[in-house]
C-alpha cells in the first residue's frame, strides 16, 4: 500500500491518492506524498530529484526475489533499521494503540455475557465485530471464535454451523484497527 523513505531529516510515505487521507492520522511524524502513478516510481523520482546517493530497504519486508532485484538496482539492505525505528512510539501512537486495545476490550466485556449454549461460532464472531465497529474501530483485520475441538486450530474460521455445547471451551482471538494501529487479544 505504500513505500517509505527515511532521510536524516524527515520520513516520507509515498502512497496512492485514495489511501493518503487514511494514512495521515497514523503517520503524523512523516510527510505523506500523494502519488497518482506508481508508488515506487514516485519514490524513485523523489530520490533522483533530491540527489539521494544511498537508499536502503528493509529485507524482512520484501520477498527474496524482490530483495535480490533491489540489491542489483543499487539499494542497500538496511537490516533491522526499520524495525528498530518502529520500536519507539510517539505519544500520539501510544494513544492510538491504547484506544485500539480499549475498543477491543470493551467489545469483549459487552459480548461475553451474551454468549450462550446453541450459538454458532460465526454468530459470536459477528457480535464481537459489530461491537468493535460500534466502539469506533476502523476495521476488523481478524476475528477468530472457536468452540471445543476447534480451539486447537490457531487460524480457525468461525463456523456458521458449529454450535456451542454446554460446558465447552470457547476461544476468541480478535482485534481491531484504529487510525492505523491494531490491537490483538486472546480470551478463553
Segments and roles (model prediction):
Residues 1-49, 102, 160-162:
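N-terminal accessory/capping or targeting/presequence segment of soluble
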Residues 6-7, 58, 146, 173:
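Short beta-strand segments
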Residues 8-10, 52-54, 167:
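A general structural motif
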Residues 20-21, 63, 151, 178:
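Glycine-rich nucleotide phosphate-binding loop and flanking beta-alpha elements
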Residues 23, 66-68, 181-182:
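Short glycine-/acidic-enriched loop or helix-start segments at secondary-structure transitions
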Residues 28, 69-72, 159-160, 186:
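Short, glycine/charged-enriched secondary-structure capping and boundary segments
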Residues 38-138:
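Flexible, acidic/His-enriched mid-domain "rim/lid" segments that flank
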Residues 82, 119-188:
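Short catalytic-site patches enriched in acidic/histidine residues
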Amino acid at each position: 500500500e505504500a513505500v517509505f523513505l527515511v532521510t536524516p531529516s524527515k520520513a516520507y510515505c509515498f502512497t496512492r491518492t485514495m489511501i493518503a487521507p487514511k494514512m495521515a492520522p497514523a503517520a503524523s511524524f512523516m510527510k505523506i506524498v500523494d502519488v497518482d502513478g506508481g508508488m515506487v516510481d514516485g519514490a524513485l523520482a523523489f530520490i533522483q530529484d533530491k540527489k539521494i546517493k544511498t537508499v536502503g530497504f528493509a529485507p524482512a519486508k520484501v520477498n527474496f526475489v524482490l530483495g535480490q532485484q533491489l540489491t542489483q538496482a543499487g539499494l542497500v539492505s538496511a537490516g533491522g533499521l526499520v524495525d528498530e525505528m518502529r520500536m519507539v512510539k510517539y505519544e500520539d501512537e501510544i494513544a492510538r494503540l491504547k484506544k485500539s486495545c480499549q475498543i477491543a476490550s470493551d467489545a469483549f466485556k459487552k459480548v461475553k455475557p451474551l454468549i450462550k449454549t446453541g450459538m454458532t461460532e460465526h454468530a459470536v464472531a459477528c457480535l464481537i465485530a459489530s461491537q468493535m465497529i460500534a466502539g469506533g474501530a476502523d476495521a476488523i483485520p481478524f476475528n477468530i471464535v472457536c468452540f471445543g475441538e476447534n480451539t486447537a486450530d490457531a487460524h480457525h474460521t468461525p463456523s456458521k454451523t458449529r454450535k456451542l455445547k454446554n460446558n465447552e471451551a470457547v476461544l476468541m482471538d480478535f482485534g481491531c484497527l484504529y487510525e492505523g494501529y491494531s490491537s490483538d487479544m486472546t480470551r478463553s
